[in-house]
């Protein structure tokens, strides 16, 4: 991303950022302190400091496309948190209307989450809200909003009809695994990248804080539920993900490196 010009449909950093990456030598104080304590010598360039003997690239789309990588980068595919426990009761019981999963995680904004849920309160859907951001006042929310704490999101495939999440990589990966469209809101730059890859693939929509403040959540939800092209792409991606085991492949790649280093 930082070292090459874009080829075809691949995403790459703009030219000015690639230029900066080649010369930037900034080191966070915590890195230099630890290096000093343990007698380590840090690389001159910042981008080199962020590399290792083996870099496991957990990107879904890098693996899906079969992108060629340069050592020490090795593609392994998605690795996401598999929360223990069962799915909440609202997921397991019979229902007559769509079930929407909302997961804003710890990086989300309580104000944005509250506004999203208020707009979904008037929709003819049930809403399952995962853990993370805590709301101090839920009195304005409808009885179709169900809070569940930590949800084993990797088990939601076949149970939900769409989701609305932040753009953290693990959250985006489990949203894709569910095989239904999602709408993603970025809380930081890295999250924009994760959402953008899914938008380009065709299984997701991006939305912003301004969309929320303008009351556009219902329109976004309607498209997630009605856009058959997007729903087909989401099913396709979910099926592809179920053939991947990033964690197992990561172990294999680490063991390969250790054997070769003997």
Mark where each language-model region is:
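Active-site-proximal region of nucleotide-activated glycan assembly enzymes
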Residues: 1-71
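Donor-nucleotide binding loops and adjacent catalytic segments primarily
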Residues: 62-162
